[in-house]
Every structure is written in structure tokens, then in C-alpha cells.
């Protein structure tokens, strides 16, 4: 039997070898087609195939035997791979469940689970109550003795250990240590006083009254708005057409700015805007022309929809809301107007946000040409943040021309009058006054980058520039890109850090010091509870591109990123988000760090004005949810940290590589605890930890870049 079996095997191998040598392409294609229909042909079918293809009966028989064997081996291999993947997922889920059981919290109070922990926490609260009562009695006795009046009884005071006062912050605005940056506590008093809840300001920050309650516009006000809109459209169009007579070159950086003499001669007579003294305010004007990868009609729609507008400019627009939608104007061309509130912020907590109430008008000039004009308008009972500069947007706008192949030519004009209530920080003063802060170049650079990103996002297959790695589906690719975009938006939002606490002992000539803020998060997409954020800005004598490449260099990342714990990092997936392959979103995999394994999602970009590198650690379970593409990425909780890189706009800066100086802002966030359980000790330890993280990261990065 063995010899017959061996003879049969050798015979089969010989025939298979002959098949490979002698079967023509036509014969193989016909056999493959028949195999897909009937993998087990009977004797008559084999003879029929042999006659048709001029093959022997044994050749047909052994070909089908070999083909069935190949198919069985392939299926078994695919099943084994699928089982391994499923087994890995189950192991990761088990590890995540074990980790969750180790850190389980009590649902009613958010505290540690277990009777002993509850008793310990209760004892701490009782001890604290005794201390507070003693302090109250001392202060009450002192005031009664020296001031002639007393304080209400302790029983009349609100329960300091009841529901969290952080829950009262509106719209998730930061509730911060200390007061605003203009009235900082002195260093000595800060070091002497205990780091308790009394140092935390949880009062909701002032919002424009109009956004909380506003009335419908009267017909008289609407008519006035229509007239303002008509004048704004005419002025913006004139500024574009009068390029040679109305625009001059800046003596500082050579960019195009409006000639103030000609502008005053032509336009200010009929303006509804009030001019301020030149000693109190300054004008910022600029114009840029770019071509973007987006259809003109889609672009117009995104400009008129405030939600899409905020998404199109995630690193500039922090808030946007449509207040009034006005009826179409009585005009031969299609025209739409609306009143919009927007808050803008860029680069660093040292840069104050700007707020506007804008009348935005869109008018179709030709079949393939649209003009969108913005101009500030005055509404009653509007109050902005107390420290924000007074900003008036003089007629500005965008001319959008449709081009072939789904592209658009965009001419952007930005013209703003700014009255600063607080002198800008010296690190960013030249950049803001030079026009690179909120100028047209920043808007157009962001527009180009986002249009390219949206174009790549909508692709139905992996482009050759991508490295999918662990991401196997196009849905997973889109999920990762969407998560990276939301991470950039969230990180840009926290940069406002309104009402922050400066630590002056950390400050230096080229360093802003460390600023800390605390907020209670209740929004989806971020961990619910208390979050501490610390940030710092500094100047580096290096071009922005060099700093950007350093922060993305995986070979040295473990030397400054605490999430790596000193272990090397590898790239698990990479998706390019623009024509420059340096702009990408990546999944990074640190080497095994004890029992807790994680992945890091990172999104970064670089353009003519600077860039960002933003990242967030994820446990493997959350990372697999993002990679699978089966989960809505907006529901995946992320807490981003990262860096904002900006060119220094100082007149002495070189244009090579975006300038010879870089302004770098870094910010780290720490999740303290859930929404219903925290102590002063938690806040103190977390603030100290995040302050140490920022300070040590600054020192390490400066040392590695030889900038000490």
C-alpha cells in the first residue's frame, strides 16, 4: 500500500508539474471557471472537458484534485488567521476588564469601591469639616471684634462636600485656579496659602448677552442691515478690483496691506462703523489668493453654515453661531445675509481670543463667481469677555471662483480694527501686530490644508502614500482621520485657558511660565469629570520645520514623551492628510510598558506659518474601536496634549524655512477624577503633576535641541 501510495503521489506530482509546464492560459482559465461552478466534476464532465481542452482524462482528474487541495489549504489558513485575530481581541477585552475591575469606582459617589475606602474618605471629610469650622469661628470672631458685624452661621453656608460646584460651569468653559492673568496672586502669597478649593474660580465666564437671550429684528433694523450688507459687498469688490491703487507693500515683511490714506478717502464717509483714535487702536489688513481642492458651491455652503465653518477652520474658530437669518435681499442677483457670532483664537494662552458680531452676506456675481462679505454690526445688550480686545471687522470677504476639476480660486481680504485692553505678551506681540496672527495668510493656509484633508478623507481606497498597517478597512481609515481632526479641534479649543493661574517662578526672558486651568467636562468625546490642563510658551532659535521634524522623530520620542516610559516607539499606521507627506495622522505603538499596553494617536501638520503636533494615549480596547471603523468616532473619549509651532514674526526673522525663530507652545492635560468625586488633595497633586510634566518637557526638549 505504501508503494502504491508513493507511486500515486509521484504520479500526481509529475502530472501537476506537467500541468504547470504544458497547460496554456486558455486551458487554465477554462478549468478555473468550471471549478468555481463545480469543484467535483463526475467522469462524464471530466471527459467532456478533456475533449474540449485537448487534455487527457488523468490530467483533468489530477488538476481538480490539486485545485481542491489548494482551496482547502487556503481556507484553513484564512480561518486560522481569523481565529488568531479574534483570540487577540478577546484577550485585549479580558485585560481591559481586569484593569477596570482594579480601578472600579462606586457609582453613587464616584469614590473607590469597598467599605474600608469609604470609611477612610468619610473620616477625611469629617476632619476637613472640623478644620473649616475652626477657621470659620476664628474669622467670625475677628470680624465681629474689628468690623462690627458677623458672618452667617455655618449651617447657612452651602454644603462644601455636596454636588460638585464644577458642574455649574456653562458650556464647558474652563474653571481655573486663581483669577485672570491681569490680577495674578503674588508669588509669596501663592506659596504660603494652602492649595484648596478657595483658589479655584468656578464662576461661569461672561458670554455675550445676545447669545443667551435676543429678540427678533424689527423691519427697520432689517432694512438697516440690508443697507450695511450692500455697502460691504461693494467695498470688498472695490478692494479686489483696485489692487494697484488701494494696496501697498508692508515695509516690515513685504506683504500687501491697505493704503490707509486712499482707504480713508474712498470708503470711510459712508461707513456705519465708528473710527477710534489711532493712539487707542491699530488696523490689520491683508490679502491672499490661493487655489483650493474643493468645488465652489460646496465651499460657499460651508462658509454660510456656522457648524461647517467652524469645522473648516478648527485651529482658528473656537465658537460660531448663527443669530439671525435675513430674508433674501431685493436684488437682481441671488443674495443671502445672516448675523453671526464668532470667537477666534490661535497659537497660545498668551494670545487673547477675539469676538465679533458679523453681518455675513453672500452674493452670486456670475454663474461661477460668488462674493462673501463680512462686516461688524452693532446689536443692543451685547457684552463680550472683559479682557478680550475690542475688534471691529471692517468690510472683509472672500471671492470664490469655480475652476475645472472641482477646484476653486479664492481671493481673501481681511481688514480688522483692534483696540487692545491688555498689552499683548512680548512673545507674540510682533506676530499679532505684524498681521500674521489673524491675517488672510493664516485663513488661506488653513483653508488649503482642510480642503486637501477633506478630499483625501472622501477617497474610497487607500492611496499609495498611506501605510494602513493595523487598519484594514477604508471605514477604519476614515474613523482614524476623523478622530485626528477632532483631536486638533479640541486641543485648539483648550488653548484659550481663560482665567488661568500663572506660576511666575517658572518664567524667564524667553518663556511664559506655566499656566494651569481646571475644567469640569460634561461633553461627549472627552472623559466626564475634572480635567487639569497646563501649558507654556517659549521661543527657540530654530526654524519651525526643524522643530516639527524633531517632535515627530520616533527615534527620540521616548526621551521626552512620558507615555513611552523610556521605551522605543514604532509606527502602527499612517494616513497622509495633504500633498506634503509630513502632514499625517498616525497610530504609534510604544513597546510593552508593564501590564498596561497602550497606543498613541497623533495628528500633525506644517505650513508656511507653522504647525501642530497633537496626540492622545488610548488603551488597546479604545484603539481597536477606532481602527475597526464600526464605532462613531465622535463617541470615543480622547484627551489630547501636544504642541503648537509658529514662526516668529519679528522683523529680523529670516524667511528661510519659515523664519529662523520658532514660538513653541506645549500643553498637557490630566484627567483627575469622575464628575462626582474629588478632593482638594486630588487637585493639588494633579496640578503639581501636570506642572512638573510641562516644566520637565520644556527642559528636555530645549536640551535635546541644544537651545539651553
From Swiss-Prot:
Keyword list, A-Z: Coiled coil, DNA-binding, Homeobox, Nucleus, Transcription, Transcription regulation
Q: Which residues bind DNA?
A: 16-75
List compositional bias (Polar residues) regions by residue number. 165-188
Which stretches are annotated as coiled coil?
119-141
The protein's matches in SMART domains, at most eight in alphabetical order, are given as: HOX, START
Domain START, first and last residues per copy: 218-456
Where does the record place it? Nucleus
What family is this protein classified in? Belongs to the HD-ZIP homeobox family. Class IV subfamily.
Q: How does it assemble?
A: Interacts with ANT, BBM and AIL1.
Describe the function of this protein.
Probable transcription factor.
Question: What is the official name of this protein in its record?
Answer: Homeobox-leucine zipper protein HDG10
**Which species is the source of this protein?**
Arabidopsis thaliana (Mouse-ear cress)
